[in-house]
Amino acid sequence: MSARWEPLGQTLINGVRVHEVRHVPKGSGRLTELYRRDWLTDDAGVDQVFQVELLAGRITAWHAHAQTLDRIFVSEGSVRIVLYDARQGSPTFGTINQFLFGEHRPALVVIPPRVWHGVQNIGGRTARVVNMVDRAYDYASPDHWRIPADSPHVPFTFPPA
């Protein structure tokens, strides 16, 4: 991370944004902001917020959406977040981003539509990941694509947790 808390050593996929967060110590514990509109430059609203529990060592991959913008925040545990830009015509086509975030190093990761993403729990206990999407899940017509974690369409192999 740079002095401005920007990721070093990797080119961010076009449209991906990362905002690292600092805990605010309080007499009763700590406060952690998950999302503020002024952190990021997108004007997309938040239409749905949900939390996913990911068991120790487990992987949920690969996911992408045609239109939905994901905003992922790890509220508990430690995870590896991997992104792959398979968008033809994107200036970062073929780029992979990898981040290690969690309760001790919190961050908001914004993932644009059509970018494949996967999450691996690298800790020894259940991780909880909050997602704040700009389009609520439509049960009748889901905007959700899924391929297996070991798919040859994504050139990344998750290491053992």
Describe the role of every protein-language-model region.
Residues 1-108, 122-161:
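Non-catalytic, conserved peripheral segments adjacent to functional cores
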